[in-house]
């Protein structure tokens, strides 16, 4: 059974609690952890568009939040960016 949801993932905590040189990698990790918690799955596949959005303005100026469309097929969760 396929399950589809749209989430707005806040990244403000990552910005406030991380040094400027580690913000983008920690933001990607935070997105994965958010999806693990809310979709209840360990296998998370992030689309390249999410990575490009986070890294778009360099590694220290990440967006405050990201809107993501998530599809769960069995145990696999696939996430893409909502435009």
Curated annotation (Swiss-Prot):
One record GO biological process: cytoplasmic translation
GO CC terms of this entry: cytosolic large ribosomal subunit
Superkingdom: Archaea
TM ranges: none
Sorted UniProt keywords: Ribonucleoprotein, Ribosomal protein
InterPro entries given in the database record: Ribosomal_eL31, Ribosomal_eL31_CS, Ribosomal_eL31_dom_sf
MF annotations from Gene Ontology: structural constituent of ribosome
UniProt keyword Ribonucleoprotein, yes or no: yes
Family affiliation: Belongs to the eukaryotic ribosomal protein eL31 family.
The name this protein goes by in its record: Large ribosomal subunit protein eL31
Organism of this sequence: Methanococcus maripaludis (strain C7 / ATCC BAA-1331)
Gene that encodes it: rpl31e
């Amino acid at each position: 059974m396929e399950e589809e949801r749209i989430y707005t993932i806040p990244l403000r905590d990552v910005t406030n609690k991380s040094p400027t040189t580690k913000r983008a990698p920690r933001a990607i990790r935070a997105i994965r952890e958010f999806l693990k918690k809310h979709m209840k799955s360990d296998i998370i596949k992030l689309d390249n568009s999410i990575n490009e959005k986070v890294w778009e303005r360099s590694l220290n100026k990440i967006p405050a939040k990201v809107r993501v469309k998530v599809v769960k097929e069995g145990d696999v969760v696939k996430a893409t960016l909502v435009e």
